[in-house]
Amino acid sequence: MKLVRKNIEKDNAGQVTLVPEEPEDMWHTYNLVQVGDSLRASTIRKVQTESSTGSVGSNRVRTTLTLCVEAIDFDSQACQLRVKGTNIQENEYVKMGAYHTIELEPNRQFTLAKKQWDSVVLERIEQACDPAWSADVAAVVMQEGLAHICLVTPSMTLTRAKVEVNIPRKRKGNCSQHDRALERFYEQVVQAIQRHIHFDVVKCILVASPGFVREQFCDYMFQQAVKTDNKLLLENRSKFLQVHASSGHKYSLKEVLCDPTVASRLSDTKAAGEVKALDDFYKMLQHGPDRAFYGLKQVEKANEAMAIDTLLISDELFRHQDVATRSRYVRLVDSVKENAGTVRIFSSLHVSGEQLSQLTGVAAILRFPVPELSDQEDDSSSEED
C-alpha cells in the first residue's frame, strides 16, 4: 500500500489518500473503511444519453464519486472490495443522494475521510504501507492424493490451489497403478507450486505432511528439476523446509507454524508471532488457569487491575457496526499498551485468528493472578458483547 497524503487534525478528524498495490491491500482497506465514512474514488457509471434526434442510448463513463458509506463487501478469495453508499458531492453524471457501488481497483488511489481516526486504524495504515509486511511464507500441506498450496501473508492465509488425485491402493505383486497415480499427483503439485508461488518474494516454502509423503514428494520434484534443468526450482532449493503435519488439510497449517524448527526460521513474521501467542495462551490455560482469561468482561476486569501481559484480539472486532462497541475494543488496546502490555491483533483470515474467534475474539495472558477474576470465573464463551 502506498500512502499519498495524510491530513488528520488534532481532534482526530481528517482524511488519507492511499493507493492499493497488492491484492492483500484490499483486505487492509476493508479493515479501514467503516459505515458513515466518506470514500472518494474513480469508478464506472452507466449513464443514459439522448442524441439530437431524440434516440436514447446508454454508455459507461469513468467518473470520480464521493460516497457516504453504507455497506462494505469483501471477497477474500478474489481480494475484491465493493463499497456501497450515496453520492454526497455534485457530479456531472450522478445526482446527489443517488446510490452507487464503487469497486476499489489496484493501483487507483482513493481518499478516505473519517470524523474520528482511532489508534488501531492508524496503526493498520502504518503496517500496510511498510514494505517489510509483505507475503514471505508459502506452504504445501499434503497427504497422498490431497494437497493445499497456501500463501501465509502478515494478514491472511490464502489457499491458492487445491490438488486432488485418486490414488488406488497398492495391490500385492502389482503397484503400477498406485505408482502412476502418485506420480501424476506429485506432478500436479509441482505445477501448482510454480504457478502460485513467487520465488522472488517468498523466503521460505514449508512442505508438510504425515509419514514420508513430504520426503518422497521433494525427492521427486528435485529429480525432475535436474532432468528438465528447471532453474527456478533448483536455485530456490534452500527455501524448501520439510516438516510434519497430521494431514493435508488447511487446518494442519496451525500445527506446522507451531513447529519449533519452523518458528525459528519464521521468527520475524507476524503470522508466526500470532501462532506462538495463541499457543502460549492455551498452555497458560492448561497449566496456570488463573493467569489466562477470555471474553470481553473478564479481560476488561484484568486490564483494570493492570494485570495484562499479552492481549490477543481479533481484527473483526474493530469492524463492529456499533461505534460504542468498536470504541470499547480500541480503548482496551490503548490501555494495555499504556500499561506496557503487548497487543497481538489477529487476522480473522488466519487459521490462528479463526481459533481466537471461537474464544469470543478477545483473550489475555496475565502477569499475575487476579483473585476476583478467579472467584467470579464463569463460562466466558457464552458472553455476547
UniProtKB/Swiss-Prot annotation:
The lineage of its organism: Eukaryota, Metazoa, Chordata, Craniata, Vertebrata. PANTHER family: PELOTA, PROTEIN PELOTA HOMOLOG. Pfam families: eRF1_1, eRF1_2, eRF1_3. SMART domains: eRF1_1. GO terms for biological process: cell division; nonfunctional rRNA decay; nuclear-transcribed mRNA catabolic process, no-go decay; nuclear-transcribed mRNA catabolic process, non-stop decay; regulation of translation; rescue of stalled ribosome; ribosome disassembly; RNA surveillance. Signal peptide: none annotated. InterPro entries: eFR1_2_sf (IPR042226), eRF1_1_Pelota (IPR005140), eRF1_2 (IPR005141), eRF1_3 (IPR005142), Pelota/DOM34_N (IPR038069), Ribosomal_eL30-like_sf (IPR029064), Transl-rel_pelota (IPR004405). Component of the Pelota-HBS1L complex, also named Dom34-Hbs1 complex, composed of PELO and HBS1L. Interacts with PINK1. Interacts with ABCE1. Interacts with CNOT4. GO terms for molecular function: metal ion binding; ribosome binding. Gene3D superfamilies: 3.30.1330.30, eRF1 domain 2, Pelota, domain A. This is Protein pelota homolog. Its cofactor is a divalent metal cation. There is a cross-link at K162 (Glycyl lysine isopeptide (Lys-Gly) (interchain with G-Cter in SUMO2)). Belongs to the eukaryotic release factor 1 family. Pelota subfamily. It is found in: Cytoplasm.
